[in-house]
Each structure stands twice: as structure tokens, then as C-alpha cells.
Design a protein with these regions (language model features):
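Transmembrane beta-barrel strands of outer-membrane/channel proteins
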Residues: 1, 19, 28-32, 52, ...
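Extracellular/periplasm-exposed beta-strand and loop segments of Gram-negative cell-envelope proteins
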Residues: 6-10, 72-76, 84-97, 141-151, ...
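Hydrophobic alpha-helical segments and helix pairs
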Residues: 67-120
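Surface-exposed strand-loop-strand hairpins of Gram-negative outer-membrane beta-barrel proteins
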Residues: 1-14, 25-41
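Transmembrane beta-strands of outer-membrane beta-barrel proteins
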Residues: 26-28, 48, 57-61, 100, ...
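Short loop/turn motifs that connect adjacent beta-strands in outer-membrane beta-barrel proteins
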Residues: 107-128, 142-143, 181
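Residues on the lipid-exposed face of transmembrane beta-strands in outer-membrane beta-barrel proteins
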Residues: 15-21, 48-52, 100-106, 132-136, ...
Length: 181
């Protein structure tokens, strides 16, 4: 029987600075809960964002790092007696994500991407446009399976006992956007 562990981050509060001027936007945020609890530096979550918006192009560059504050929500294939609503804190997972999003606006003479998303320009009439996009992100997960409860480790398949998972996600998108003024 295949085994499955599902994790989700615990809710947390962030505080940060976000500065925008004309076509450039820079943001930084940090988990407030980690500052308040004075946890060690390894556990802190951080986020950086840099966005550039012009009439034809939009670019987002981002970096996100999570702390070790997760919950195990679903367990399958280990024990039949584990209830379906099982939930337990887990501090053995850390995630780093780096990414880039690119957008091209076809009707850039009438449609304003910055007016819709960054409020840095005005658009005087209703207008729509087709938008093409490209996105790529690199994900690095550090997984310490020895932080799992003992009864899960005992039944864990050897193939699930990994320390690092790395993958890259890339996609191309095409859509339509419309601004009502």
C-alpha cells in the first residue's frame, strides 16, 4: 500500500516593507511570530519581492523561505488506526523558493497592467488585452524524517527517508485581462 504524508504550514503573521515608485516595486517581509518568540535564525521565514511593470512587460522576481512550523495533516499507508482527522506539529521541514514571472501585454496602448496591479498609473477608459506569460521557480525542501513521530518512522518505507528534495517548475500561460474604469 502506498504511503502518503501531507503537511501544511501553521498560520503565521508577517510584517514587512513594500516600496513602489513608478515602475519598480521592492518588498520584504518576515514572520512576526518568530521575532516575538525569539526563535533561532534557522527557523525564521523571510520573503523578498522585486517587481518591474512597464506598459508592455511585467517582471516579478521573488524569494521565499519558510520556517520549520508545519503540521502533519494526513497520513495514509502507515497504520489503520490513525484517525482521518489526525493533526500534529512537525518541525522537520524547511522550504526555499526562488522564482521569476514574466508577462507580455499585447494591447499596451490602451490597457495598463500597472493600473490594475500596482496602482502606479491611470487608465482612463475600459480596455482589455491578451497577456502571455512565462514562469519558472526552483524549490528546495529540507526534510528531516527523524523529526516524525516514532510510530511513523517505524513503518516508513525506505524510499520516503529523504533529506532533500529539489525541483524546478516552469510554465507558459496565455489569458485575457480587462480593466473596468
Amino acid at each position: 500500500q502506498p504511503q502518503k504524508l501531507s503537511f501544511s504550514p501553521n498560520p503565521h503573521n508577517k510584517i514587512g516593507l513594500y516600496f513602489g515608485w513608478r515602475w519598480i516595486f521592492l518588498g520584504w517581509s518576515v514572520d512576526v511570530d518568530d521575532i516575538y518568540r525569539k526563535t533561532n535564525r534557522k527557523n525564521k521565514g523571510t520573503e523578498f519581492d522585486l517587481s518591474l511593470y512597464s506598459s508592455k512587460l511585467g517582471v516579478d522576481i521573488f524569494y521565499r523561505r519558510t520556517g520549520n512550523n508545519y503540521k502533519i495533516h494526513k497520513i495514509r499507508g502507515f497504520y489503520d488506526e490513525i484517525p482521518s482527522n489526525y493533526s500534529e506539529n512537525f518541525n522537520g521541514l524547511k522550504v526555499d523558493i526562488k522564482g521569476l514571472n514574466l508577462y507580455y501585454i499585447f494591447n499596451n496602448r490602451k490597457f495598463s497592467y500597472p493600473a490594475a496591479f500596482s496602482q502606479s498609473t491611470n487608465q482612463r477608459r475600459n480596455a482589455g488585452t491578451f497577456i502571455a506569460g512565462f514562469s519558472i521557480s526552483k524549490h528546495n525542501l529540507d526534510f528531516d524524517y527523524e523529526e516524525l513521530p516514532e510510530y511513523i518512522q517505524e513503518k516508513m518505507n525506505p524510499g520516503m527517508k529523504v533529506n532533500k528534495i529539489k525541483y524546478t517548475n516552469a510554465n507558459i500561460s496565455f489569458g485575457y485581462a480587462y480593466n473596468w474604469v
